[in-house]
Amino acid sequence: MSSEIEKLFTFVEKLVDSDARKVFEALYEAGEELSEADIATKTGLKLNVVRRALNSMAEKGLVVYRRQKHPQKNKLVFYWRINYEGLPSIIESRKRAAHEKLRTLLEKEESVHYYVCPRDGTRYTFEEALDHEFICPRCGSMLVLDEERELRIQILKQYIKMLEDELGGAKAS
């Protein structure tokens, strides 16, 4: 299995959950529409779990369905497939949202100085540290200036650049 497909499965799992990933994998491997019962059989998941995963993925635009009346049972059967047409825009919008969150985090990281507890690693803004007289309210240790600030800023910048490159250089605003 290619790394791109594995990334897509991981994306589905993070966006929804592990059951949705199994359902998505079953749809991908089938390469065609599947009924809910067929998906349950292929994944080993209960039918209600399959339906919940499918509905969650449908809300996010990852899968689509069509209804068809069953000829003998006189009930509706839902046939599901991956929404290949919509996936690129869904992934791009998630990347844009992540880009915006990272930009906000970077701005905060660059503008605020943090103090950290050397014992438990809890971070406090200068104002919070001042309120506690530079003593950790949890353990009583002396708070020290966060020395990893520059490293965190550098990492955030790298992730932001990576997302901007993937988004075609267009900066999300």
UniProtKB/Swiss-Prot annotation:
GO biological process: regulation of DNA-templated transcription; transcription initiation at RNA polymerase II promoter
The keyword Calcium belongs to this UniProt entry's keyword annotation: no
Function: Transcription factor that plays a role in the activation of archaeal genes transcribed by RNA polymerase. Facilitates transcription initiation by enhancing TATA-box recognition by TATA-box-binding protein (Tbp), and transcription factor B (Tfb) and RNA polymerase recruitment. Not absolutely required for transcription in vitro, but particularly important in cases where Tbp or Tfb function is not optimal. It dynamically alters the nucleic acid-binding properties of RNA polymerases by stabilizing the initiation complex and destabilizing elongation complexes.
UniProt name for this protein: Transcription factor E
Record-linked SMART domains: TFIIE
Taxonomy of the source species: Archaea, Thermoproteota, Thermoprotei, Desulfurococcales, Pyrodictiaceae
Assembly and interaction partners: Monomer. Interaction with RNA polymerase subunits RpoF and RpoE is necessary for Tfe stimulatory transcription activity. Able to interact with Tbp and RNA polymerase in the absence of DNA promoter. Interacts both with the preinitiation and elongation complexes.
Keyword Secreted: no
Family (UniProt): Belongs to the TFE family.
Keyword terms of this UniProt record: DNA-binding, Transcription, Transcription regulation
Domain of life: Archaea
Limits of the HTH TFE/IIEalpha-type domain: 4-88
Molecular function GO labels: DNA binding
HAMAP family: TFE_arch
This protein's domain notes: The winged helix domain is involved in binding to DNA in the preinitiation complex.
InterPro entries: TF_E_archaea, TFE, TFIIE/TFIIEa_HTH, TFIIE_asu, TFIIEa/SarR/Rpc3_HTH_dom, WH-like_DNA-bd_sf, WH_DNA-bd_sf
Species annotation: Hyperthermus butylicus (strain DSM 5456 / JCM 9403 / PLM1-5)
